[in-house]
Amino acid sequence: MKVTLPEFERAGVMVVGDVMLDRYWYGPTSRISPEAPVPVVKVNTIEERPGGAANVAMNIASLGANARLVGLTGIDDAARALSKSLADVNVKCDFVSVPTHPTITKLRVLSRNQQLIRLDFEEGFEGVDPQPMHERINQALSSIGALVLSDYAKGALASVQQMIQLARKAGVPVLIDPKGTDFERYRGATLLTPNLSEFEAVVGKCKTEEEIVERGMKLIADYELSALLVTRSEQGMSLLQPGKAPLHMPTQAQEVYDVTGAGDTVIGVLAATLAAGNSLEEACFFANAAAGVVVGKLGTSTVSPIELENAVRGRADTGFGVMTEEELKLAVAAARKRGEKVVMTNGVFDILHAGHVFYLANARKLGDRLIVAVNSDASTKRLKGDSRPVNPLEQRMIVLGALEAVDWVVSFEEDTPQRLIAGILPDLLVKGGDYKPEEIAGSKEVWANGGEVLVLNFEDGCSTTNIIKKIQQDKKG
């Protein structure tokens, strides 16, 4: 199944925060200065790129979404360079000019793909009247699908709590890339996106994934957040939401050259995807793929729709992820040549919960590769009734494909996956619940081929039906 990109062109996002100009001086170096033990760089190329909150807006615009940017600048060449660069990529700028301060500028000197030094030109904007920014936010709220607050602790978000309240009253989700350890400032936000270091600076060192989840859920409760996304570098990302199983997504980066601005890309793609009408789980899936692209570039960078589509398709192209039936058969054949044991299971997986995650993790431990076959929407409706599925097939497959335990995800249209299983013939067929092995669809075919069939227990107390009933009861209450 081909994963469809969000309709970014219908998404409107406002970014408010610390804007800055990133300057890059490039050149060769072949000698050490006689004045001090430092390399001499002969500068032959100079580049200027929007940074900080401006880079977030650039990332949103590069996807084809409508991006508006509000921030504080000086009245200087750097501000003019920022405005021109952003206008060239269709970012609508509405800066508040502060004549007493310079525009924040960061100068990096690079040679042979290595950053040698960074020079910062800045004065904090603390104490600047926030009212002009509040007015700009209020004027835009009726026409945007998400508000991003990009905090680099330079003073533009000194009144962040008022900004959150403005958006909440308008029903607009607020996404924040936090800075520092005072998360009380961000109380009531829809989503925070700290990296692991920022997260641990607040909750303490986490030795295990379980500790990340436990402390993250407490942080959500303490600060009345709707969700938390912890970006974990080479370990991917972890999405935490109240009442839902944690979603751990492995990194998609092939090579890492520069992590500059990667957090900007993540929150930019998250916001654009949500504003386009997609779910938070889908937004994290696309943001994770985009992060894998941008860290493979040098310097502050953005991701285009073509790059994002290629990254999303990348797992299937390399033999993993969401697949068609024919692609899966080729992937399984390649796995068998490598001597790998293939495990297969199936289900609706409508609202993914902890029971599903534990079950799939246990199934994966029984072999080297795990296939999850998913009922199509029509198949689910016939099986579960007209009110199901809650989540359409594409969303269900995307979420399953993001799980570390799952190697391949494929769909089937029939009431049972018997035909599909007969075509794949896994080494081990597993099913959760209280079935007898001979009752499981495809068991006869697997046995006839010399394979095994096994029934695994589900985690007690976890049920999609019960979750739906509770949601319905809460709505009535």
Swiss-Prot record:
Catalytic activity: D-glycero-beta-D-manno-heptose 7-phosphate + ATP = D-glycero-beta-D-manno-heptose 1,7-bisphosphate + ADP + H(+); D-glycero-beta-D-manno-heptose 1-phosphate + ATP + H(+) = ADP-D-glycero-beta-D-manno-heptose + diphosphate
Keyword Protease attached: no
EC class: transferase
Keywords: Acetylation, ATP-binding, Carbohydrate metabolism, Kinase, Lipopolysaccharide biosynthesis, Multifunctional enzyme, Nucleotide-binding, Nucleotidyltransferase, Transferase
Taxonomy, superkingdom: Bacteria
GO biological process: ADP-L-glycero-beta-D-manno-heptose biosynthetic process; lipopolysaccharide core region biosynthetic process
Xref: CDD domains: RfaE_like
A GO MF label: ATP binding
Residue(s) carrying N6-acetyllysine: 179
The enzyme's E.C. designation: 2.7.1.167, 2.7.7.70
Location of region: Ribokinase: 1-318
A single Gene Ontology CC term: cytosol
Quaternary structure and interacting proteins, as annotated: Homodimer.
Similarity annotation: In the N-terminal section; belongs to the carbohydrate kinase PfkB family. In the C-terminal section; belongs to the cytidylyltransferase family.
Protein name, per record: Bifunctional protein HldE
Species whose genome carries this gene: Shigella flexneri
Organism ancestry: Bacteria, Pseudomonadati, Pseudomonadota, Gammaproteobacteria, Enterobacterales
Gene (name only): hldE
